[in-house]
C-alpha cells in the first residue's frame, strides 16, 4: 500500500487529504475519529512499537473491505489512539482484537494500551524481544479473558503490576509455547477478585528477589500452579497471598 492511501477508508475529501502522523491538532483527531467510525466490523488492530523511537504505527486490517485492505496511521504519542478513539471502534458490539508487538520498547510501562472499558477479550501475540510488561493491563476493568503466546526468549521480563486491578478478569492463558523468564512480579496479579485459576508452570523465577503482594486480593483464586517456581533468591514475600482465597 502506498503512503498516500493511509486514510482512504474514510471516503470524505478531508480524510483522503489528511496529513499522516499529525495528531497534535483538532482537525487531525477529528479525521481519525471519522475513520474509526466507518470501519467494518471485523478488524485487526496491530500496534508496532519501534525501537528507540516514540513514534508508533497502528495498522488496522479491514478484512471485509475490498478496495483498501488496511490503513496505516503514525501516532505520537500513543495516548491519541487509545482512550476515546478506540472506544469508538467498540460501541456497536464487543470486538476481538489481536495485538502484535514488534521490537523492544522501553516505554511500555508508561503506555497502558487497554484503557478501553468496552473490550472484554484480548489476545496478545508477542514475537519480539520486548521485555517490559510493567502495568501493561493495569486497571482494565472489563476484560474477562487474556491469552498470551510466544513468550519465549532468553531475556528476563519485568511484570510488576501487569494484571493489577483487573476486577473482571476470570482467565489468563499462557500458551504452551511460552517459556517465561521473569525478573520482577510485585503486585503482578493483585486485586483480581474474579480470577480463579493461574497456571504459571512455564515461569522461571530464579532471578526474582521480590514477590510481595503478587496475588493480593485474589479472593476467588482456587488453583495456582507454581510448580516451576525457584525462590532461592527471593528476599521479600510480604503480603504475597494477602486477602487471597488460597
Where are these predicted regions, by residue range?
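Structural signature of tandem-repeat unit edges
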Residues: 43-48, 64-68, 120-128, 142-155, ...
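Register-specific detector for alpha-helical tandem repeat solenoids, activating on a conserved position
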Residues: 33, 134-135, 160-161, 186-187, ...
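Predominantly recognizes leucine-rich repeat
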Residues: 164, 190, 216-217
Amino acid at each position: 500500500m502506498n503512503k498516500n492511501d493511509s486514510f482512504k477508508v474514510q471516503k470524505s475529501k478531508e480524510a483522503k487529504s489528511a496529513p499522516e502522523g499529525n495528531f497534535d491538532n483538532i482537525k487531525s483527531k477529528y479525521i481519525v475519529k471519522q475513520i474509526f467510525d466507518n470501519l467494518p466490523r471485523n478488524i485487526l488492530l496491530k500496534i508496532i512499537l519501534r525501537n528507540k523511537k516514540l513514534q508508533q504505527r497502528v495498522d488496522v486490517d479491514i478484512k471485509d473491505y475490498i478496495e483498501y485492505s488496511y490503513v496505516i496511521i503514525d501516532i505520537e504519542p500513543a495516548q491519541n489512539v487509545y482512550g476515546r478513539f478506540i472506544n469508538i471502534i467498540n460501541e456497536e458490539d464487543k470486538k476481538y482484537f489481536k495485538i502484535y508487538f514488534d521490537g523492544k520498547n522501553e516505554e511500555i510501562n508508561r503506555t497502558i494500551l487497554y484503557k478501553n472499558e468496552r473490550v472484554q477479550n484480548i489476545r496478545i501475540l508477542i514475537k519480539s524481544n520486548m521485555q517490559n510488561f510493567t502495568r501493561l493491563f493495569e486497571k482494565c476493568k472489563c476484560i474477562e479473558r487474556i491469552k498470551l503466546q510466544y513468550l519465549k526468549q532468553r531475556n528476563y521480563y519485568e511484570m510488576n503490576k501487569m494484571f493489577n486491578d483487573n476486577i473482571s478478569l476470570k482467565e489468563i492463558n499462557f500458551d504452551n509455547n511460552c517459556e517465561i523468564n521473569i525478573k520482577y512480579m510485585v503486585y503482578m496479579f493483585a486485586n483480581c477478585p474474579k480470577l480463579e485459576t493461574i497456571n504459571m508452570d512455564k515461569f522461571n523465577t530464579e532471578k526474582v528477589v521480590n514477590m510481595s503482594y503478587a496475588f493480593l486480593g485474589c479472593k476467588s483464586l482456587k488453583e495456582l500452579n507454581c510448580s516451576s517456581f525457584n525462590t532461592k533468591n527471593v528476599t521479600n514475600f510480604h503480603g504475597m497471598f494477602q486477602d487471597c482465597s488460597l
